[in-house]
Amino acid sequence: MSSTWYPPPSRPRPVEGGIKARSTRGAIAQTWWSERFIAVLEDIGLGNRLQRGRSYARKGQVISLQVDAGLVTALVQGSRARPYRIRIGIPAFGKSQWAHVERTLAENAWYAAKLLSGEMPEDIEDVFAGLGLSLFPGTARELSLDCSCPDYAVPCKHLAATFYLLAESFDEDPFAILAWRGREREDLLANLAAARADGAAPAADHAEQVAQPLTDCLDRYYARQADINVPSPPATPSTALLDQLPDTGLSARGRPLTELLRPAYHALTHHHNSAGG
């Protein structure tokens, strides 16, 4: 018989309006990305201890949960009067890393369409892996876990409850995973839309027309630089000159002299044009 004495387990104080897990039994995660998150936590050795937080998550002991770039914070009500403060840290990707991710996602119409419609592409992990990044935590060391409770176990039941509700929050909003890594939904979608629009634009639209200095083209100053379409002058009636003559008052057979000369002027002009001017 062991001589080590452990205090009896204490019951947590009830919470009004706490965040309760939607699942009342069985697995908590519902979508592939939240299931993947839980699976990753189990793979890195946190699985057995996560079970301690299921009852806390389902009872609504988590008072608040917030996801920011690189940090998840929560308040969890335990057996003491003051709630415990939870912090789960993960390295957020930098601007240049996200720029590479967004460029790669934008190049694939399927990825862009899925994300713009609010869904997480099933092989999005491959995009990050191809750039030397990991969307989900790769090792336990990548996570920084902290709880203000006196329990020495890591993760304690308060951290475990937070992990479960974090997975459920990923069910509701898959972009929370990306926000945890440093990119908010609005920024990601705006950058994807801009990258798609920029990539679809003709290359000629982006080419700058740089004028050469005059000293670099003096030898071509009088040469034709480009074909210029010069509109032809409007056609002038061949008898327009007759219309400019003053009235002579002369007539023949009851017709003005200018009218009698008009056919002759027309014939003369036609003959001149046919001969090549």
Curated annotation (Swiss-Prot):
Recorded superkingdom: Bacteria
Listed InterPro entries: Znf_SWIM
Keyword Zinc: yes
UniProt-listed PROSITE patterns: ZF_SWIM
Listed GO MF terms: zinc ion binding
Zinc finger (SWIM-type): 139-167
Signal peptide segment: none
Coiled-coil region list: none
Keywords: Metal-binding, Zinc, Zinc-finger
Presence of keyword Zinc: yes
Pfam families reported in the protein's UniProt record: SWIM
Protein name per Swiss-Prot or TrEMBL: Uncharacterized protein Rv2102
Organism: Mycobacterium tuberculosis (strain ATCC 25618 / H37Rv)
Lineage, uppermost ranks: Bacteria, Bacillati, Actinomycetota, Actinomycetes, Mycobacteriales
